[in-house]
Amino acid sequence: MEVKVLSSKLVKPAYNGGVAAAPDVEYIPLSIFDKVTYKMQMAIIYAFPPPAPSTAAIEKGLAAVLAQYRAFAGQLGESPDGEAAVVLNDRGARLVEAAVDADLVDMAPAKPTPELLRLHPDLEGELQEVVLLQLTRFRCGSLAVGFTSNHVVADGHATSNFLVAWGRATRGLPMGAPPVHHHAALFKPRPSPHVEHDHRNREYYLPAAGDDSHGHGDGGAADNIVIHKAHFTKDFIAGLRAAASEGRGRPFSRFETILAHLWRTMTRARGLSPDEASTIRLSVDGRHRLGAPAEYFGNLVLWAFPRATVGDLLTRPLKHAAQVIHDEVARVDGAYFRSFLDFALSGAGGDKEGLAPSAVLKDVLCPNAEVDSWLTFPFYELDFGTGSPTYFMPSYFPTEGMLFLVPSYLGDGSVDAFVPVFNHNLEAFKECCYSME
């Protein structure tokens, strides 16, 4: 796919339609949740059918929404007191215009491949912007929107709120409630800190001397990884849930059931020893658990770590894997989040012990896995005035074992799972992916 870049510019916030002066520079201190999350760029791809909205309309909407979401027009830096912060300096978001002399249906892959990276701005070198966008127009009139944002500034929940507001601003509609930012008094340890969980070995780890095993993208593993798209129909999911929940008063959730099935499927395809242990890392949103508003803009996520032996996963029924996931997620409740705050902010651990965040990127997760579930995020509500996107998916991210769960664009309750696997495990994965056994 040959992509021709036409222009690149910074889009700055437009206050009150561009007639009001910009406010003074402000600083949003990074919260402890921002500091322990992944230091990575989160990249997603949208596709809109013709007639696609004009670039001028999209840019105008972007300038308007950045006035409300200033963090996405700022930069990562330091506050005057030397603390890590998002600097609200209105530098702007990078907007790239590009074109492809071909029809989208002939060029766009149905699953993430290296070619998808051409639908994003170049991410090489030191990035100055928090948000980078590329609008790529195809010969047929379709539009691809490549969106990239710094994960340290906002998690998936916050980013999806921004995207919906961007669409509304482009259509001239109210953007909704403004974002609520972190401040020094928002997350604090309790007067009498009470650490109830082993945060040293969950959110943190103690690096060994000279430990460089937590790198990403420098080991050549990506050449042997393919991202497989598994489509689970509503009927298939219903069958899985019925099988997993048999004899249980309250059925397992759609997420618990699909993840349990994929955990077992990946484990079987990998051909692991029965005595080997497998752990899943999955995000748990803390907004409700800590009583934070839904509009909180930043990171407010910790992780659950379901763990089981390969033998148990493969010889015991689906119900077992679903129960392990359910119990571990339930454990990460409000008390768990408060225990983490006490540990991380009271001086009980963290930097003083030489600990580092365990949320680090790897090329290969085997025998473990990680899941990003976007099943409840309103990504499909991004509408620039010509309707919802025809599809939405994560961009190319070749980390073996990193799963993404996304609602299908069909809108019928089906789910798409994007599963990076080794080439030599792909056929084994396909063989058991749609089996109820």
UniProtKB/Swiss-Prot annotation:
The active site is at 151 (proton acceptor), 383 (proton acceptor). Coiled coil: none annotated. GO terms for molecular function: acyltransferase activity, transferring groups other than amino-acyl groups; hydroxycinnamoyltransferase activity. It holds the Pfam family Transferase. Gene3D superfamilies: Chloramphenicol acetyltransferase-like domain. Keywords: Acyltransferase, Transferase. Highly expressed in roots. Expressed at low levels in shoots and flowers. Its EC number is 2.3.1.-. It comes from the Eukaryota. Hydroxycinnamoyl transferase that catalyzes the transfer of an acyl from p-coumaryol-CoA to putrescine, to produce coumaroyl putrescine. Can use feruloyl-CoA and caffeoyl-CoA as acyl donors. Belongs to the plant acyltransferase family. This is Putrescine hydroxycinnamoyltransferase 3. The gene is PHT3.
